Amino acid sequence: MYKRKLCLSTNSTFGVSEPEQVRLFKEAGFDGFNVLWWGDDALVENCARAGEEHKMIFQSIHAPWNYCADMWDENEKEDAIKGVEQFKHCIDLCVKYNVPVMVAHVYVGFDEEYKPTAFGIENYGKVVEYASEKGVKIAFENTEGTEYLDAVLNAYKHLECVGFCWDSGHEMCYNYSENLLERHGDVLIATHINDNLGIRDYNGKIFWHDDLHLLPFDGIGDWDELAQRVKKTGFSDILTFELNNKSKPNRHENDKYDEMPLEKYLAECYIRACRFASMIDR
């Protein structure tokens, strides 16, 4: 897109291999892609090769989150160590394939009291220190438990290697539509742009089934307001969209996407991406 690069996240639900997705993203008009790494180093290598072949930007590698909660819990020291080492390995992959950013969650868990600990800050500090040594930026993403995100960013966002990944959908369905760009937009380095229907439960109980990853403009997001918020941060780097063509369990909001041929769905993703980007840049 003129004066704005657009990126789409690969997705195991798209029905073709991630390297093939890179080719299809290019054909649809996107400039870049990212990959969720869950221990499959060969997947990252194959996507990097596809990116080189099709002249696509490898925007980021998304780290796993299975040890994120343990990294805050002194009673789970062995798993906390595993979490730190897992993040370090993901950083190594970024170095190996010239990927500038690792996206990382800082917590995962529902139905509990969110209390950041010094133990957690110390563990994430080890990851941050390693990223700094390796020349990789970490984009910490908003998920459930913004208390943990705030704790990590307040401790480390003064460092050049630390920034914020804003997930517009998580903000609506996990963070009660708090304006997190107002809080951390000064270090915005990555985006996961998507839509949803907010929190389904009347009493405000959050759950991952609400994290629909609809195309922008298909949910309740106020996209004029969101565009103005992004614009206010001054962020001019590649915009990443994280979208899903499959519905969550016992939900049907994404079914219409799954009924489309993948090429048609990706074309619609690109249309929505351009529409939102133009609202930021006008």
Located regions from the model:
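N-terminal pre-domain/capping segments
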Residues: 1-89, 95, 132, 150, ...
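Hydrophobic faces of well-ordered beta-strands that scaffold small-molecule active sites
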Residues: 4-10, 33-35, 58-63, 102-104, ...
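Acidic-and-aromatic substrate-binding clefts and catalytic sites of carbohydrate-active enzymes
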Residues: 11-17, 34-46, 109-114, 143-148, ...
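A short, acidic, flexible beta-alpha connecting loop/helix-capping segment that sits on the rim
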Residues: 13, 240-262
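Acidic/histidine-rich catalytic cores of soluble enzymes
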Residues: 33, 125-220
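Active-site acidic/histidine proton-transfer and metal-coordination neighborhood
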Residues: 53, 73-163, 260
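A short, acidic, amphipathic alpha-helical segment used as a generic capping/interface helix at domain edges
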Residues: 218-232
